[in-house]
Amino acid sequence: MNDSSHAFSSDGRAGPPASPVVDTAAVPGVEAGVSPLVEGENVLRAHGIRKRVGGPDGELVILSHVEMDVSAGEAIAIVGPSGSGKSTLLGLLAGLDSPSEGTVTLLGKDLGSLDEDERARLRAGRVGFVFQNFQLLPGLSALENVMLPLELAGEGDADERARAMLADVGLDHRAGHQPLQLSGGEQQRVALARAFVSRPALLFADEPTGNLDTDTGEKVVDLMFSLRGKLGSALVLVTHDHALARRCDRRLRMDGGRLDALADTLPGEAGGTPE
């Protein structure tokens, strides 16, 4: 995936759940009765997505004819072997890269019609990101990292909301610490605070537990699902963790550049094919 600064700056399957009722009273900084979602509509749609890159042996097709819809409040897991194109797809869906063919509509906006600054503003205001390696900016404090998307979106109460969000993840006492002064689990909790502080309609998570031990990873995942449940945020999750994938409403498998709905068993589970 691209560096997180690009996310914020210009530089089996169950059907989609009913549109959630957001427990706004439980979320710091969220006004009563205000939902960040467009109820009953897709927050993300990908149509006919292909991604090709040049190589020494000619053109390489990374993604081929990908179709995908995500409804408001829905959680979708994308699984598959390493190198299958999962993270590439996530970057395209988030507008961090552009497809060779096809269209991505994010929160009602055709990403192909937006310039880089417009994409960055859209992400800063309505989209959250969580990465495997945390992607916190090392020169900023935990508080400043959490404030970043709010400041880029022009929000006037960034400090207050960021402090409330850090308290919600149990790190208000670490607000002045820089990332290297924090443990891996603490860094990922700061990343979650940054991802959710803008009350996102959609969260992209790329292997969020990949650099954490099992116990810490489980706590981070519980926190992520708790926060998204309170806000009603949709989730697109790339993971190798089968237990984590099972917590989602739908599971899709990426293999050979193609995306397919997955049956009730995942590879490596009883009845599944090992990866």
Where do the language-model regions lie?
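ABC-family P-loop ATPase nucleotide-binding domain
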Residues: 1-52, 260-275
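ABC family nucleotide-binding domain
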Residues: 41-254
